[in-house]
Amino acid sequence: MVGRVQPDRKQLPLVLLRLLCLLPTGLPVRSVDFNRGTDNITVRQGDTAILRCVVEDKNSKVAWLNRSGIIFAGHDKWSLDPRVELEKRHALEYSLRIQKVDVYDEGSYTCSVQTQHEPKTSQVYLIVQVPPKISNISSDVTVNEGSNVTLVCMANGRPEPVITWRHLTPLGREFEGEEEYLEILGITREQSGKYECKAANEVSSADVKQVKVTVNYPPTITESKSNEATTGRQASLKCEASAVPAPDFEWYRDDTRINSANGLEIKSTEGQSSLTVTNVTEEHYGNYTCVAANKLGVTNASLVLFRPGSVRGINGSISLAVPLWLLAASLFCLLSKC
């Protein structure tokens, strides 16, 4: 705030006498030119504000005041603020320059002129605009599918910033309004990803920040591929599953868990697994089960390794015919990393 300096007590009588001459004692008129009311000057935070005041003749006695007190009386500076100075581009100008304007400078300023005829005042109201700035936003969050999620984005600025939320996907929905909170009820896996908060006003470019929302859900088999193979050749069965966290895989032949050994090799990466028979024999033909599990659930698919030309009893479609005890045992084993 543009403040004022307290005069030395020894000089107080002289100061008071000078102010009596400088400042009007009667009712003020509207402005120096008699035709305008209070002028509004709009300046962005950090810029320089120039509050114009032009007198009628060189003999006029002028002072600048604001709600805090006297800023300038004639050419004597009363304010302690180093950002404030007079601007006189010609003899009749008595403008006030405020550098690096901040929000606390906002308010009414008065140029008071004492002429030979009557006192006059010109008022200027300084409006300080502030670019939008996000001050608080939710941290990245992980929730289970079906949960309710509330994201928070708070911003400062003048005028008040408009908050806009957007889901950053190709078909991402945009949530517009001045709401600081974005509520997602019963969140689904499709609603996972990054959410962008944009705070905007007319002062400058928008401030943008992001929140990542991770949605956990149980495994779903997305593809299971049976295969045919002749004896003596290599063959693979493949299984893919979607889940968050990524699923762990196990393979079974009948009710027996399969390990990578004796010509069988299991390879699993995030979201997919394959069982490879390096040298197919008659005993390898038949039904196999791919089990995918994470901490939220377990699912399975049945696949077949069959002889060329034979009728496919199972074509690789998802099946739930596996005994419940096997699914329960698989889930327990996967979660305990047995």
Swiss-Prot record:
Role summary: Mediates selective neuronal growth and axon targeting. Contributes to the guidance of developing axons and remodeling of mature circuits in the limbic system. Essential for normal growth of the hippocampal mossy fiber projection.
BP terms from Gene Ontology: cell adhesion; locomotory exploration behavior
Pfam families the UniProt entry points to: I-set (PF07679), Ig_3 (PF13927)
Family from the record: Belongs to the immunoglobulin superfamily. IgLON family.
Annotated ranges, domain Ig-like C2-type: 29-122, 132-214, 219-304
Protein name (database record): Limbic system-associated membrane protein
Disulphide-bridged cysteine pairs: C53-C111, C153-C197, C239-C290
One GO CC annotation: postsynaptic membrane
Residue positions where Phosphotyrosine is found in the record: Y94
Topological type in the membrane: Lipid-anchor; GPI-anchor
Species of the source: Rattus norvegicus
Keyword match ATP-binding: no
Maturation propeptide residues: 316-338
Tissue: Expressed mostly by neurons comprising limbic-associated cortical and subcortical regions that function in cognition, emotion, memory, and learning.
Keywords (A to Z) from UniProt: Cell adhesion, Cell membrane, Disulfide bond, Glycoprotein, GPI-anchor, Immunoglobulin domain, Lipoprotein, Membrane, Phosphoprotein, Repeat, Signal
Subcellular location: Cell membrane
